[in-house]
């Protein structure tokens, strides 16, 4: 994407995302695409709509926020549900103004100063019960939209006599996909640890396994060191130790399906003979880059292909109904031991235990710093890119068809 202006290299740039309707009657400006869910409250969507008064004469201009759950095509065939279910919709009229606007945010002040007249601020808020942006990755051969939760901000001009949004001419509307995301809490939980023991036939004493992690929360891309201690008091040999990061996606909105997918794994061929103890470490790095071809992996919602990653662990506010949260994501480390049998490989058995942890983004910069005064010279405008992903292919096709009309 090409910026529309240049700024001093010494000044920090504030990227402003803009998108203009096809008939150029309305243009929307947002300061960011990711809005943080702090569990107790969610950052509001604040922006500006630039209106061409001649082109919208006799019309009203609105901005709306929609949260939708999209079902995959396979889900429609199996359970007979519609393709999309709106979980939330809110709308505000920005032109003509219907009431005195509140104090503008720093972003809005700077944009109104930069853009001049015919600019109208808006503020859209999220209720605390909405899910975060998450989707289940389709396989490369899958066509159409995939299962997931997305958020859309829409600005549109509508005749005063029309009450239904679906009657809005596409040429007079503009849509932006945004994301609602969660970041790691400031306080970590206790150090994850699990122990398990198994009793085998013909062995008087058990096989004992202890697994521990150094902390409860890991950031995306951060190596996870797993400490494994095997105390083998049996007459059998532990032939292999394997550790996996497993992602569990619980689709709670229309069913209670669980999708458990390994997203990283490591193993050691170190053996633990009878009546001996071994302590070893295995390092795992769960990354989307190693799982791009795998169907059903939960991802943070997509805006651009390179912007996404494995879905972050879901944090649920106390008292919220889980069934409206779309897709809940959690992670655990599973450690498997392969134990020899009486007849060697033919009768080998596996035992395993799990340790939960959270995979998240680090806390962003201090909000007080992030909201420092926006200076005109630091505003860099970027056109909001059209979606070119499989899960948004249909919207792109519709947009292209509209452009050809």
Swiss-Prot record:
Transmembrane segments: none
Molecular functions (GO terms): G protein-coupled receptor binding
Keyword annotations of the record: Cell projection, Membrane, Phosphoprotein
InterPro entries for this protein: Arrestin, Arrestin-like_C, Arrestin-like_N, Arrestin_C-like, Arrestin_CS, Arrestin_N, Ig_E-set
Domain of life the protein comes from: Eukaryota
Entry's Gene Ontology cellular component terms: membrane; photoreceptor inner segment; photoreceptor outer segment
Consequence recorded when altering residue 14 to C: Requires 2 nucleotide substitutions
Pfam families according to UniProt: Arrestin_C, Arrestin_N
In-chain residues carrying the UniProt-annotated modification Phosphothreonine: 234
Listed GO biological process terms: G protein-coupled receptor internalization; signal transduction
Purpose of the protein: Binds to photoactivated, phosphorylated RHO and terminates RHO signaling via G-proteins by competing with G-proteins for the same binding site on RHO. May play a role in preventing light-dependent degeneration of retinal photoreceptor cells.
Complex formation: Monomer. Homodimer. Homotetramer. Interacts with RHO (via the phosphorylated C-terminus).
Family: Belongs to the arrestin family.
Disease implicated: Defects in SAG may be the cause of generalized progressive retinal atrophy (gPRA) in some breeds.
The record's note on its domains: The C-terminus interferes with binding to non-phosphorylated RHO. Interaction with phosphorylated RHO triggers displacement of the C-terminus and leads to a conformation change that mediates high-affinity RHO binding.
Protein name: S-arrestin
Source species: Canis lupus familiaris (Dog)
Gene encoding the protein: SAG
């Amino acid at each position: 994407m090409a910026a529309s202006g240049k700024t001093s290299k010494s000044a920090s740039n504030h990227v402003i995302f803009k998108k203009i309707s096809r008939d150029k009657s309305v243009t929307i400006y947002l300061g960011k695409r990711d809005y943080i869910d702090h569990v107790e409250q969610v950052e509001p969507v604040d922006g500006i709509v630039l209106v061409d008064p001649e082109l919208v004469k006799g019309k009203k201009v609105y901005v709306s926020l929609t949260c939708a759950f999209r079902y995959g095509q396979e889900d429609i065939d199996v359970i007979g549900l519609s393709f999309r279910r709106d979980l939330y919709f809110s709308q505000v009229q920005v032109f003509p103004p219907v009431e005195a606007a509140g104090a503008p945010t720093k972003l809005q002040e700077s944009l109104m100063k930069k853009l001049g007249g015919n600019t109208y601020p808006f503020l859209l808020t999220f209720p605390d019960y909405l899910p975060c942006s998450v989707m289940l990755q389709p396989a490369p051969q899958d066509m159409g939209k995939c299962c997931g939760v997305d958020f859309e901000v829409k600005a549109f001009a509508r005749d005063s006599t029309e009450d239904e949004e679906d009657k809005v001419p596409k040429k007079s509307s503009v849509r932006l996909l945004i994301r609602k995301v969660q970041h790691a809490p400031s306080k970590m939980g206790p150090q994850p640890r699990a122990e398990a023991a198994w009793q085998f036939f013909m062995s008087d004493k058990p096989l004992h396994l202890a697994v521990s992690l150094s902390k409860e929360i890991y950031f995306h891309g951060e190596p996870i060191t797993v400490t494994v201690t095997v105390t083998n008091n049996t007459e059998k040999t532990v032939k292999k130790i394997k550790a996996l990061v497993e992602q569990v996606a619980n689709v709670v909105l229309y069913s209670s399906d669980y999708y458990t997918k390994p997203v990283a794994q490591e193993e050691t061929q170190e053996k633990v003979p009878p009546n001996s103890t071994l302590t070893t470490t295995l390092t795992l790095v769960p990354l989307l880059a190693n799982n791009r071809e795998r169907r059903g992996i939960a991802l943070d919602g997509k805006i651009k292909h390179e912007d996404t990653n494995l879905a972050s662990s879901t944090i649920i506010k106390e008292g919220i109904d889980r069934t409206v949260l779309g897709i809940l994501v959690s992670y655990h480390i599973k450690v498997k031991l392969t134990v020899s049998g009486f007849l060697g490989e033919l009768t080998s058995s596996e035992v395993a235990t799990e340790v939960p942890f959270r995979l998240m983004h680090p806390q962003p910069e201090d909000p007080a710093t992030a909201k420092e005064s926006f200076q005109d010279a630091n505003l860099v405008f970027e056109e909001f890119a059209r979606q070119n992903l499989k899960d948004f292919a249909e919207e792109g096709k519709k947009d292209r068809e509209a452009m050809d009309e």
